[in-house]
Design a protein with these regions (language model features):
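Small-residue-rich hydrophobic segments that form or flank transmembrane alpha-helices
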Residues: 1-56, 110-113, 117-190, 194, ...
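A helix-boundary/kink motif common to multi-pass secondary transporters
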Residues: 6-7, 63-67, 140, 197-201
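Short, aromatic-rich membrane-interface segments at the entry and exit
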Residues: 37-40, 68, 129, 199-204
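Transmembrane helix exit motif
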Residues: 53-65, 73-96, 211-227
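Short glycine/proline-centered loop/turn elements that form peptide/ligand docking sites
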Residues: 101-102, 128
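Juxtamembrane cytosolic amphipathic helices that cap and anchor the N-termini
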Residues: 104-109
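Loop-to-transmembrane alpha-helix initiation sites
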Residues: 152, 197-209
Length: 227
C-alpha cells in the first residue's frame, strides 16, 4: 500500500524478514508444553520440511481455486468439530490432553503435515490447519504451538529464505524492520498466550480456524488461480 518495497521484492522480503521472528517464536514455544513427546514434534517438523521439497512440484500443479474452496470447507468443518468439543455438544468427545501421538494417529499427523508443507509453496499457510490437526488428533491444545511454529521456522530458515537471499530478491531495510519489530511482538504474544487457560486457548484456536476458513473462501472468489 505504501509502495515502500518494490512489488517484485515483496515475496522475498516477507520470507527473509519473518524468518527471525518465526524462529524465535518456535524456540519459545518448544518449551510451552515441557513434556511434549519429541518423536511427535520432530516427526511433524521433518514431514513439513520434506513436503516443502518433495510435494512442492506436485501441489504447484493443483488448481489453486479448487484448493482454496476445499480448504474453506475443510477448515470450517474442523473448526465446528472443535467448537463442539469445547462446548461438549455431539458425539465428538472432549478436548484432548495427550502430549504425544502413536500408531495411526502419528501416521495421520506425519502425512497431513507433509502435504501442508507442500501447500506452503502455493501460498497456503500452515499455522491454522496444523493447529486444527493437533487438536482433532487429541493433543493438548498447547502442543499445537510448537508443532506449527517449529514446522514454519525450519521451512523458512532452510527453504525459501536462503534462496531469496542468494538471488538478492529482498529489501534489506524492510527485512531488518520486520525482524526487529516481529521479534518484539513474538515475545509479547508468548507471555499472553502462556497465561491463557486451556479452554480459552482452544476457543482462540477455533476462532483462528473459522477466520482462516473464510479467508480461503475470500481468496478463492477474489484471486481465483492467482497466487
Amino acid at each position: 500500500m505504501t509502495k515502500s518495497v518494490d512489488d517484485v521484492l515483496i515475496p522475498g522480503t516477507l520470507n527473509v524478514g519473518d524468518t527471525v521472528p518465526v524462529c524465535i517464536e518456535a524456540f519459545l514455544f518448544f518449551d510451552f508444553v515441557p513434556d511434549m513427546d519429541l518423536l511427535t514434534l520432530i516427526s511433524m517438523i521433518v514431514a513439513s520440511i520434506a513436503g516443502a521439497y518433495l510435494a512442492a512440484g506436485i501441489v504447484s500443479r493443483f488448481n489453486r481455486k479448487k484448493v482454496r474452496y476445499a480448504l474453506f470447507v475443510g477448515m470450517f468443518i474442523l473448526a465446528t468439530v472443535m467448537l463442539c468439543k469445547v462446548l461438549g455438544v455431539g458425539p465428538f468427545g472432549e478436548i484432548g490432553t495427550a502430549t504425544g501421538l502413536r500408531g495411526v494417529k502419528l501416521i495421520i499427523a506425519i502425512v497431513a503435515n507433509f502435504f501442508l508443507g507442500g501447500l506452503m509453496s502455493i501460498g497456503v499457510g500452515l499455522y491454522a490447519p496444523c493447529m486444527a490437526l493437533c487438536v482433532l488428533l487429541g493433543l493438548d491444545t498447547g502442543c499445537a504451538f510448537p508443532a506449527m511454529m517449529g514446522s514454519c521456522a525450519y521451512l523458512m530458515a532452510f527453504g525459501n529464505g536462503p534462496k531469496f537471499i542468494q538471488e538478492g530478491r529482498y529489501d534489506p531495510v524492510a527485512c531488518w524492520t520486520q525482524a526487529i519489530g516481529g521479534a518484539v511482538g513474538v515475545f509479547l504474544a508468548f507471555f499472553i498466550v502462556k497465561s491463557m487457560s486451556l479452554r480459552t486457548l482452544t476457543i482462540m484456536v477455533v476462532c483462528v480456524c473459522y477466520l482462516t476458513s473464510f479467508l480461503f473462501l475470500h481468496d478463492a472468489i477474489k484471486k481465483g488461480e492467482a497466487a
